[in-house]
Structures are given as C-alpha cells and as structure tokens.
Amino acid sequence: MLSLLAVVSLAAATLAAPAASDAPGWRFDLKPNLSGIVALEAIVVNSSLVVIFDRATGDQPLKINGESTWGALWDLDTSTVRPLSVLTDSFCASGALLSNGTMVSMGGTPGGTGGDVAAPPGNQAIRIFEPCASPSGDGCTLFEDPATVHLLEERWYPSSVRIFDGSLMIIGGSHVLTPFYNVDPANSFEFFPSKEQTPRPSAFLERSLPANLFPRAFALPDGTVFIVANNQSIIYDIEKNTETILPDIPNGVRVTNPIDGSAILLPLSPPDFIPEVLVCGGSTADTSLPSTSLSSQHPATSQCSRIKLTPEGIKAGWQVEHMLEARMMPELVHVPNGQILITNGAGTGFAALSAVADPVGNSNADHPVLTPSLYTPDAPLGKRISNAGMPTTTIPRMYHSTVTLTQQGNFFIGGNNPNMNFTPPGTPGIKFPSELRIETLDPPFMFRSRPALLTMPEKLKFGQKVTVPITIPSDLKASKVQVALMDLGFSSHAFHSSARLVFMESSISADRKSLTFTAPPNGRVFPPGPAVVFLTIDDVTSPGERVMMGSGNPPPTLE
C-alpha cells in the first residue's frame, strides 16, 4: 500500500471535529489518515472497502508511480487508502452495482485534463470494478476500454439506477462542460448493458430544463421508475416506454443540480411494498435568471415533500413538512431501522462553483450545516424530524461531498471541494478548501453489545424462507424485530443512486438463537444483485452480512 507521506498523517487531528462525548449518543469519529483524493463519489463494494473517485486534475496528493490518481479504495477497517488507477476523467459521474456484483461507474467530464496526467474524456466512459474478495483491495483493479465499452451518448452529470433485470438505467446529463445550468442536455435514457442501439428520447428531461442535472430516480416495486428533476416528477414505464406525469413539487421548490435537494425511496414493507418518495432541501430560485444574478447568500429551503405512489396518493399530491434548517445539497441515507439520516449541505447558495455573483472563494454556497438530523417515516406529520442526541462536526460537507452507510452500520462521510482543482487548506481567499479528512458518523449501538447474524447464505432466491443462527444481547427484550435487505447505493452530488431498504417478514425462535425471514418476492421489489442484511432488535442493529439477491448472473445483453 502506498503512503501519502506527510499529507496522510496524524497532523490531520489538529483540524479535528469536536471530541466525542462520553454520554451515549451519535458520534463523529475523525479518522487519523487522509483520503488522498476528494471523495466526491463513493460506493461500498465489500465489507471493508469503499471505492471513491475524484476529478482528473493531476494535482491530487495520492500518487501511483509518481503520478496523481483520482481513484482510491478506502479501507473501513484500517482507515487507510490504496490508490486505484483510473484512465478516463470520472468527475461528476454516476455508478451502481450490477446483478452479478460488478460496480460500474459511467459518464464524467468532457475533454481531457492536464496536470501531471493526461486523462481522456470521461463523458462516454464505462469503468468496471469486478467483485473484489480481498478485504484490503490487494489485486483489485478498474477496467476501462473506451474504444469498445462506452455509453451511447455523452453524459456529464448523469444518474443511474439498477432496475428489475439487474441492469442499469442511465438518465440525463450534459454533453458539454457547463458552469451552471444544463445548456446542451442529454435528454435521453439508455441502459447498461445496452437494450437497444440508440438512446431513448425523454420528453420529461426536455421539460425539466435547465436545472435537471443528476436527476433523482428510484426503481419502484412494480418495475417502473420514479424520476424527479427540477420541480417536476414522473413515473417512467421501461417496458412500455411511457411516462405518467405526477404533481410538481409544491411551492416552486427545485431539487436537482445546480439547485440540489436530495431524495430517497422510503423503506418498503411487506406485504404490499407501497412506495413513497421523500424529497428534501433545494431552493425556490428562479431558473430564468442567469447564475450571475444569483447569490451565495440566497436562502436554501427547509421544505421536505413526500408522496405515496398509489393512485390515491398521487391524487392527494405531495405532503409538505420541514427540516429543522434549510439545506442546499443535503443527502438522505437509509438507517437500517427504517429512519432516514439527513446530513451535509449548506444553508445558502447553490451547487457548482464560481458561477454566482458573489462566490465565497470559489463556492456558490455558504453557511455549512454541521448537525445531522433523523427523519422517522411513521411518526406523525410535524414530529418526524429531530436532531436530539446528534453531534455537530466542524468539517463542512457541501459541494462534492459524500456519505454512505457501511456494512458495520455506521456512516462514511468524506469530500467537499467547491474549487476547480485540488486547493489545500491555507490557500489565500479560500474559505472552503479541498477536503481530504474522513469521518464516520457512529450510531449509539456502535458502543454497546449488538445482535449478530452468525451465518448467511451466499445467495438468496426471491421468495425464499431462510433460517439462520443469531445471537441477541441478554438486555434486549426483542419487543421489536426488523430485518432489512439493503442496497447501500452510490453517493454523489447530494444523491444516493440505487439506495434501497426492503423490510422482510421475520420471526425469532423461542430460545432467541435463530432468525427466520422471507426474501422479497421478485426482482421488482428488490432488483437482483448484491445486498446487505441487517438485524435490528429494539433499535440496536447488528453488523451487516452481504448476500447476493438472485442468481448472481450478469444482466441481459443486447443480442
């Protein structure tokens, strides 16, 4: 493993977040080593590794053979980083896991970049990271062949989501570099592996211009896909190639880049797996104005909007509630007990950089929000959001930040870089430098004895009933038992692509030594592919166990 020399040192502790309290509660834990690249994209690929990507500026501290790299493997067990060689520029790409466990990163920056490397354009790139069995990442590499494996259309700032056959639907983006709005849009959908020879045009993406980069999309349990962009939303039927227009987000709130709110598919529960979507943050800014007429001090919104995707729910429309504070660029992440973590973001301004009338250094945003909150979906309206017992960090996590649940049950948090290049702390005129510090946000159960799943089948069939051995701490009454099947998702630009939590019917034996649960009925409820199972007893969650949902075969390809 390569050293980051002085850059990756315990000196980072001098810039640490506040020390954790001795009292029980959530805690931020600043790691002793730096990431070497800005973690602006992150995805968990096994029990101990997070793949992170940066942009190819050629000035990152992390090196391979003396040259900068913009990919890395972060080891959750040792808090160390291993460089990962990347060919094309992965800046502002998307990604997900296929049905066979392969991680795919797609899209990126148009045009090559310089520095001490010459990276080819990334906006048609497909980057493939095969399943990695090594806990440290030793021998695990990224595959690229731009001449033969590439997108049908150029895409910078696209989104992606794993769908019912285990392939990826790739949505939107820009053909060209753009400082703020989407001025040369890729108003289309395509798939990986490809399902046809040409992209599918999207009237929805055309309507939702100009603030529709990184659309938020979720695979619904009937196989359709919910998409929200700008202040508009639809349900897209992949098999019929039709769209159903849904109500606009209330009060003119816009939620996609460069006016970033976040969105999440709320946990799905048996027997009906009724889908609901929550959208939080963003802004009411007027997109008819040029970015130079906007301000880094423009207030973000505290609004959250929630819709039930049934005929009755769609007719009723979005239900409005509010976070404890306004947030631009928040991120919403599933907690295994069914709550939603709300973290990161800024109180004012916008995404992107150096585009508004009064950037803060290079940042279009200001006033970082430093205290997370929890959203409880089944609590009464007006009482769903709380930050009681939540810690406060000193590290801004705004533009180009990431967060993801890990298999250990805590949250990896990294990144922040509203600058064109790697910009170290102390750079004159820069309030928000490139951030290499990594934290975890640790729930209270991390500091006590926990339930454990002692074994788990390597693969689960849809609808399969399984009994596995467990242990339960003696002080837990087991009055509430939850078994969650989760896709931990791909974090980038205030959105968690493919993130999913499906609760499974379950029971515990009288002697508390075994757990019986039933897997989801089909690949529409949980798209086939890698998953993590968590057991939560009385809000104390076990470490997760990885399984392959379905056969583990690759998704279908175009014949």
UniProtKB/Swiss-Prot annotation:
Its main location: secreted. Glycans are attached at N33, N46, N100, N231. It is an enzyme of class 1 (oxidoreductase). Keywords: Glycoprotein, Oxidoreductase, Secreted, Signal. Disulfide bonds: none annotated. One of its GO terms (biological process) is hydrogen peroxide biosynthetic process. Its EC number is 1.2.3.15. Pfam families: Glyoxal_oxid_N, GO-like_E_set. InterPro entries: Gal_Oxase/kelch_b-propeller, Gal_Oxidase_central_sf, Glyoxal_oxidase_N, GO-like_E_set, Ig-like_fold, Ig_E-set. Optimum pH is 6.0. It is found in: Secreted. It catalyses: glyoxal + O2 + H2O = glyoxylate + H2O2 + H(+); methylglyoxal + O2 + H2O = pyruvate + H2O2 + H(+). Catalyzes the oxidation of aldehydes to the corresponding carboxylic acids by coupling the reaction to the reduction of dioxygen to hydrogen peroxide. Substrates include, methylglyoxal, glycolaldehyde, acetaldehyde, formaldehyde and glyoxal. May act as a source of extracellular hydrogen peroxide required for the oxidation reactions catalyzed by the lignin peroxidases (ligninases) and manganese peroxidases, both involved in lignin degradation. This is Aldehyde oxidase GLOX. The gene is GLX.
